Amino acid sequence: MLFRSAGASVTHVDASKGMVAWARENAAASELADRPCRWIVDDCAKFVQREIRRGSRYDAVIMDPPSYGRGPGGEIWKLEDNVYDLITLTEQVLSDDPLFFAINSYTEGLSPAVMEYIVKTTLCPVKGGHTHCDEIGLPVSATGGVVPCGATAIWEK
């Protein structure tokens, strides 16, 4: 939403029709319904493959993939098994001078160090730049602590 509010053209892709509908509702509630956005219900990897064939390029990519999912034919998708290929594929649609790439992971199987390693070994050799990674956590008001629930990795020039 932030990028739409700044005037960026946004493409939102999710395999779940319900998630795309929810994102549209959030855009409307944020008074951003009139800003440019392509709302696409599709498998993200298949969408990226088509964008590669079309020659489409993006200055920034934000990924928030599920930890686990099933395709329409019952195929099982696990982030731990597919994250490397998904990032490698997505690198091909980044522009020649991209701004950043960010990915979140909500699985215990991908620590911040692992996420950073994957992003560093897939994007840095091709695009240069640097990475940073951190843990995603939920604050616990009763104790003041934080419950770890995933990792985020960001690449930028």
Language-model features: where?
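Mobile active-site "lid"/loop adjacent to the S-adenosyl-L-methionine
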Residues: 41, 59-89
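C-terminal catalytic and target-recognition region of SAM-dependent MTase-like enzymes
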Residues: 98-157
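Short, well-ordered secondary-structure micro-motifs
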Residues: 50-52, 72-74, 113-114
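Short glycine-dipeptide loop
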Residues: 89, 94-101
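Conserved SAM-binding motif I beta-strand of class I
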Residues: 9-14
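Conserved dinucleotide-binding and phosphotransfer motif residues
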Residues: 6
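S-adenosyl-L-methionine
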Residues: 16-62
